[in-house]
Amino acid sequence: MKRHEAREKALQALFQIDVGHIPPDEAIGNVTGSGEVDPFLRQLVFDVIEHRAEIDELLRSNLEKWKLERVANVDRVILRMATYEMKYVDDVPVSVSLDEAVELAKKFGDWKSGSFVNGVLSKVKAALQK
């Protein structure tokens, strides 16, 4: 599985976990079927959950005029995934994480999601480089 596809599946699984409050393994199974689970997909899902408090704090400090809880569910999940990658995944360049997140937002979010995600993650990127 390519990383782009793993990100899409992770987004779908994390969305189910966030909105439907289902266990991570069940959510991953829902999006992958009964096949073997890609290690990057599994890493994204479980590590975003594990680091959620730190990720959310970083997002809150970079959201202007928004509360994280008021951000659209799909956008919030995309922001969490990308922030996790930018902060914790060393083998993925920050610019790749940001670009992938914008593409996911354009595909799965509404017409404003791409620019919103880009704006927030650009601030997160700057904060992480300090």
From Swiss-Prot:
One Pfam family in the UniProt entry: NusB
Family matches, as CDD domains: Terminator_NusB
InterPro entries from the UniProt entry: NusB-like_sf (IPR035926), NusB_fam (IPR011605), NusB_RsmB_TIM44 (IPR006027)
This protein's UniProt keywords: RNA-binding, Transcription, Transcription antitermination, Transcription regulation
Gene Ontology BP, a term: DNA-templated transcription termination
GO CC entries: cytosol
Single GO MF descriptor: RNA binding
Family, per entry: Belongs to the NusB family.
Biological function: Involved in transcription antitermination. Required for transcription of ribosomal RNA (rRNA) genes. Binds specifically to the boxA antiterminator sequence of the ribosomal RNA (rrn) operons.
Name assigned to this protein: Transcription antitermination protein NusB
Organism from which the protein derives: Geobacillus thermodenitrificans (strain NG80-2)
